[in-house]
Design a protein with these regions (language model features):
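Activation targets extended, charge/polar-rich intrinsically disordered C-terminal tails
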Residues: 100-249
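A substrate-binding/cap region within the structured catalytic cores of diverse enzymes
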Residues: 69-119, 123
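Glycine-rich catalytic cores of cysteine/serine-nucleophile enzymes that process amide/ester linkages
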Residues: 10, 14-84, 112
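N-terminal, Lys/Arg-enriched amphipathic/low-complexity engagement segments
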Residues: 1-7
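Exposed alpha-helical structural elements
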Residues: 42, 61, 85-90, 98-99, ...
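A broad "ordered helical/assembly scaffold" signature
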Residues: 9-11, 47, 150-156
C-alpha cells in the first residue's frame, strides 16, 4: 500500500496500550518514511526505554512497529496519506536528525499535557514535528515552545481524556509514567487530561490539509480488514459492507 501510494512518508498510528475504557483506540503514532536509513518505511518515533528510563528517537522497522500491541485486543493501524507538498515537507522534517532531537523532551509522561514542555509523550513529539514541517518556524532555539504556540494558533485540539474517577488522577502522583503537575489546575479539578493522541493528530491533519486519504486496518482471528475513509472500523474488527477482508497468512 505504501509503495503504491507514490508518497515518501505517511503518518501511522497503532493500537498498543488498551485504552478502551477511555474510548480510545490508538495510543501511538510516528512517521513511516520510505527513505529512512534504517530500512525503507521504518517508523521514526519517540520511544521510552524502560531500562534507560528516558525517551529517545527510535527508527523501528514497520513490521516491528505493527506487532507491538496488547494481545488482549485486536491489532489496529491507521495510515494518513497526504498530498505531495505536505508530504515532502513532513518527510524532510522527520528525517532531520538534529531537529528530531531538538524537539525531544527530556522527561516522558504518557499523559503529558499537550501545551507544556515539562513532559512529552510520543504523539506530542509527532504534533510538534508537524508544526516545524508546516509552520516555517525558525530553528535556532526554544523549539518546543515555538511548536506548541504554532499548534495552538492553528487550532490543534488535544484529546480530552475523562478521568471519571478520582483515583485515576490520584494514581498520577504514584505511577512513574503518569504525571499531573504539568496539567492546569482547572483540568485536574474537572478530572480531564488534555493529551496529544493519534486521534487528535488525525483530526488536525484532516482539518488543515485537503485531499488526505485515510486507510485503517485491523487483524483478528487470522484475517485482515481494510477500511478506507474517516469513519472507523467497528469495534471488534468487524468488516463493513465496503471493506476488504484478506487472510492474514
Amino acid at each position: 500500500m505504501l509503495e503504491k501510494s507514490g508518497s515518501d512518508a505517511a503518518i501511522i498510528s497503532r493500537s498498543g496500550t488498551d485504552l478502551t475504557r477511555f474510548h480510545i483506540r490508538y495510543s501511538h503514532s510516528g512517521f513511516t518514511l520510505k527513505k529512512n536509513e534504517n530500512t525503507p518505511w521504518s517508523v521514526r518515533q519517540l520511544y521510552y526505554g524502560c531500562e534507560d528510563q528516558k525517551p529517545s528517537i527510535f527508527d523501528q522497522g514497520l513490521s516491528g512497529f505493527l506487532m507491538t500491541h496488547d494481545d488482549n485486543i485486536p491489532s489496529y493501524v491507521s495510515v494518513l496519506l497526504l498530498p505531495k507538498p505536505e508530504t515532502d515537507a513532513m518527510a524532510k522534517t522527520a528525517l532531520d536528525n538534529k531537529l528530531s532531537v531538538e524537539l525531544l523532551g527530556n522527561d516522558y509522561s504518557a499523559n503529558a499535557y499537550a501545551f507544556s514542555t515539562i513532559y512529552q509523550n510520543c504523539n506530542q513529539w509527532v504534533a510538534e514535528m508537524l508544526a516545524f514541517a508546516w509552520g516555517n518556524l525558525s530553528s535556532n532555539d526554544d523549539f518546543r515552545n515555538k511548536a506548541q504556540a504554532w499548534l495552538k494558533a492553528n487550532a490543534y485540539k488535544p484529546t480530552d481524556i475523562d478521568a471519571k474517577y478520582s483515583y485515576v488522577v490520584w494514581v498520577g502522583h504514584m505511577i512513574p509514567l503518569l504525571h499531573t503537575k504539568d496539567h492546569p489546575s482547572e483540568n485536574i479539578d474537572r478530572k480531564i487530561f488534555q493529551v496529544s493522541m493519534p486521534a487528535a493528530i488525525e483530526e488536525f491533519v484532516k482539518n488543515r490539509v485537503d485531499n488526505v486519504s485515510r486507510v485503517e486496518m485491523c487483524l483478528k482471528d487470522n484475517r485482515i480488514v481494510i477500511h478506507r475513509g474517516w469513519d472507523s472500523i467497528a469495534d471488534g474488527c468487524i468488516a463493513g459492507p465496503e471493506d476488504d477482508v484478506l487472510p492474514a497468512s
